[in-house]
């Protein structure tokens, strides 16, 4: 997913 405020859990974006 995209490192967005919602998809950060998928992308590893903390």
Swiss-Prot record:
Enzyme class name: hydrolase
Known catalytic reactions: Specificity close to that of papain. As compared to cathepsin B, cathepsin L exhibits higher activity toward protein substrates, but has little activity on Z-Arg-Arg-NHMec, and no peptidyl-dipeptidase activity
Subcellular location: Lysosome
Entry GO MF terms: cysteine-type endopeptidase activity
Keywords in alphabetical order: Disulfide bond, Hydrolase, Lysosome, Protease, Thiol protease
EC number, UniProt record: 3.4.22.15
Primary residence: other
GO cellular component, one term: lysosome
Keyword Phosphoprotein tagged: no
GO biological process per UniProt: proteolysis
Assembly description: Dimer of a heavy and a light chain linked by disulfide bonds.
Family: Belongs to the peptidase C1 family.
Purpose: Thiol protease that assists the parasite in burrowing through the gut wall and liver of its mammalian host.
The name this protein goes by in its record: Cathepsin L2
Source organism of the structure: Fasciola hepatica (Liver fluke)
Lineage: Eukaryota, Metazoa, Spiralia, Lophotrochozoa, Platyhelminthes
């Amino acid at each position: 997913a995209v490192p967005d405020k919602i998809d950060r859990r998928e992308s590893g974006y903390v």
